[in-house]
A protein has these predicted regions:
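Rossmann-like dinucleotide-binding domain that binds NAD(P)(H)
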Residues: 1-43, 50-53, 154-157
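C-terminal glycine/acidic-rich active-site capping loop/insertion
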Residues: 2-6, 25-39, 59-151, 176, ...
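Short, solvent-exposed aromatic-acidic interface loops
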Residues: 49-51, 80-81
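Short beta-strand segments
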Residues: 44-46, 56-58, 176
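Stable alpha-helical structural segments in soluble proteins, enriched in small hydrophobic residues
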Residues: 131-135, 162-173
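Hydrophobic, well-ordered secondary-structure elements that form the walls
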Residues: 139, 156, 173
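C-terminal substrate/ligand-recognition segments
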Residues: 151-152, 156, 163
């Protein structure tokens, strides 16, 4: 993800939760682990589930839609930024107010039958964009031949810091921040 976005910095903050749900075999690391990272310009949510064959998917959500990157495809799902249904917050409204809001919303927003807008998405498919084998190959060739690898040690350190912050947050049961001045992970 950091490579795709061109980021070369550790997250400013991380908050994790998780549990040992599938493999209660004495391990101390969660097999279900979710973390929300604050990189300053964008929040990043990362989920790790051990013991299931879920595909690796990156989803980037923006004001124009969603870009989904998988091993075999890159797909763009356009979104207009406009509501496609009445607000779900109305369930807390009194019944009379809710009914009036829903009726008004449909009167103002429902498309004319046969004139519903169609948002066209795009999908680009390939054999496999799995970068693990090429990544490891470039690394070992770089070490063996004393050549520059794709990313430098600072990039690797920053990526590893995100993992360490996630784990520290899980064990502390609170948000953590990276203190660059002291070179330590601290509770937020």
């Amino acid at each position: 993800m950091n490579f795709m976005l061109g980021w070369n910095a550790p997250p400013k903050k991380a908050m994790s939760l998780g549990a040992i749900l599938r493999f209660p075999d004495g391990r101390n690391m969660p097999d279900v682990h979710a973390t929300l990272f604050d990189y300053g310009s964008a929040p990043v949510y990362l989920r790790l589930n051990l013991g299931c064959e879920t595909p690796e998917i990156y989803r980037f959500q923006g004001s124009k839609g969603i870009l989904e990157v998988t091993e075999f495809a890159i797909t763009y799902y356009p979104q207009t930024g406009e509501d496609s249904a009445p607000s779900y917050y109305t369930s807390g409204y009194p019944q009379k107010m809710r009914d009036a809001y829903v009726a008004q919303w449909h009167a103002e927003h429902d498309p004319v039958p046969g004139k519903e807008p169609v948002l066209e998405g795009y999908t680009y498919r390939g054999d496999s964009w799995d970068d693990e084998k090429p990544h490891l190959w470039r690394y070992f060739q770089g070490v063996k031949n004393h050549q520059q690898v794709t990313e430098d040690a600072v990039f690797g350190n920053n990526a590893a810091l995100a993992c360490h912050m996630s784990n520290e947050s899980y064990f502390r049961k609170s948000a953590v921040v990276w203190d660059a001045a002291s070179g330590t992970i601290k509770s937020a």
